[in-house]
């Protein structure tokens, strides 16, 4: 295919990374084409109202949080916010547990009231010493001991990654807090909120503010590169795909989602479980660490959105193996996978006039705010390199 038009920047991927870079470059006067193989923008943060009238996150829950005022200020140009205290529970041994691990969890474990000092003493006896944990198993048993590790972490991690925690980097489970007080909030960042009209609406306003962006949906990388002559390429997809899997496919985990909606009597019957009318479960997210349960978690995002609707939708999340042609969600956080990526990183470094940003392009897990920060920094670098565009 011969190129039939030209642009200044060709950006592959219409998620956070691609759209933020495009907005900043367009603001500097450059023409940008953003292409995405999916039929919608927003990447994995895409949300929409389903048939039950419930706003749902189509690719798993996206809990926005950050400690960066700069990132909040930037995104606030395109959205208002609904502040959220994200709550999670775990379901094991036939009951709901407070999670992350805290004093309430300990009381549930021993079946009687306890004080912080009681829990601290118990932890001191239960912990297994690992001064410098080498993997996720060592991280958790050094924090909470073997019993809580097996109850909440081992089975969940095995399902999520199809690898034992001792095969995974220490960072995987090191992200989960453990507290000896009653604080059961999942996250610790100073700003925790959702876009008040959803992520898709936020991205829509970003595009409305940027007439220099030409969004092409349903267009894959090969077609976009063949169709548009460009000065510089920004690639946010999988780095091994960019190189045609020349060195073999990198390992990823994929996901499958099953949504189910409830209303009327079916929803009313759940009040005894959820604790409040209009909801199916007692928290926004419930983890299922039992290895015999095929899904890892059930998410009811209505807890966080605050949407007033006489229905609710739950989404069960099933980890899945990934093969080329499928949807890669998570790079594998393990030494062998990281070593395989380094060979692709060397190829990427040698590419001229190409930027690789985002989770898949750099084969590393990032939160949304980190992706935004990366995109802002790359846009600044590109404007410094190329100067201002001509509009």
Model regions and ranges:
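Structural/interface elements that position substrates and couple domains in central-metabolism enzymes
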Residues: 73-74, 139, 148, 278-281, ...
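Glycine-rich, N-terminal phosphate-binding loop of Rossmann-like dinucleotide-binding domains
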Residues: 14, 237-238
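Short loop/edge segments at beta-strand edges and connector loops
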Residues: 13, 85, 215-219
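C-terminal segments that line or cap access tunnels to active or ligand-binding sites in enzymes
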Residues: 231, 241-389
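Dinucleotide-binding Rossmann-like beta1-alpha1 core, especially the glycine-rich loop
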Residues: 52-126
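N-terminal Rossmann-like FAD-binding beta1-loop-alpha1 element of flavoenzymes
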Residues: 7-34
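Active-site/ligand-binding neighborhood in enzyme catalytic cores
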Residues: 93-232, 236, 243
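Glycine-rich FAD pyrophosphate-binding loop
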Residues: 26-51
């Amino acid at each position: 295919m011969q190129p039939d038009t030209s642009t200044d920047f060709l950006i592959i991927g219409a998620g956070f990374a691609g759209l933020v870079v495009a907005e900043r470059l367009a603001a500097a006067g450059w023409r940008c084409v953003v292409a995405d193989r999916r039929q919608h923008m927003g990447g994995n943060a895409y949300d929409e109202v389903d048939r039950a009238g419930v706003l749902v996150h189509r690719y798993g829950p996206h809990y926005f949080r950050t400690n960066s005022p700069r990132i909040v200020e930037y995104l606030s140009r395109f959205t208002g916010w609904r502040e959220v205290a994200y709550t999670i529970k775990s379901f094991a041994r036939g009951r709901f547990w407070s999670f992350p691990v805290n004093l309430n969890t300990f009381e549930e474990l021993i079946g009687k009231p306890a004080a912080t000092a009681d829990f601290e003493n118990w932890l001191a006896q239960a912990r297994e010493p690992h001064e410098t944990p080498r993997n996720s198993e060592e991280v958790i048993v050094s924090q909470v001991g073997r019993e809580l590790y097996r109850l909440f972490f081992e089975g969940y991690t095995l399902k999520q990654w199809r690898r034992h925690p001792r095969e995974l980097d220490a960072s995987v489970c090191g992200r989960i807090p453990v507290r000896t007080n009653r604080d059961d909030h999942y996250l610790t960042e100073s700003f925790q909120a959702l876009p008040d009209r959803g992520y898709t609406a936020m991205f829509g306003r970003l595009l409305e503010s940027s007439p220099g962006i030409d969004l092409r949906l349903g267009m894959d990388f090969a077609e976009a590169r063949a169709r548009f002559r460009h000065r510089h390429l920004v690639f946010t997809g999988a780095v091994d795909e960019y190189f045609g899997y020349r060195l073999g496919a990198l390992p990823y985990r994929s996901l499958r989602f099953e949504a189910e909606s409830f209303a009327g009597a079916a929803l009313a019957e759940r009040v005894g479980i959820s604790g409040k009318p209009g909801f199916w479960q007692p928290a926004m997210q419930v983890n299922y660490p039992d290895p015999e349960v095929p899904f890892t978690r059930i998410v009811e995002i209505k807890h966080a959105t605050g949407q007033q609707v006489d229905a609710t939708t739950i989404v069960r999340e099933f980890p899945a193996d990934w093969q080329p042609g499928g949807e890669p969600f998570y790079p594998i956080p393990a030494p062998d996978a990281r070593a395989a990526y380094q060979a692709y990183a060397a190829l990427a470094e040698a590419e001229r006039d190409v930027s690789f940003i985002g989770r898949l392009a750099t084969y590393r897990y990032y939160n949304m705010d980190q992706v935004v920060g990366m995109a802002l920094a790359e846009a600044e670098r590109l404007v410094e390199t190329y100067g201002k565009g001509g509009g």
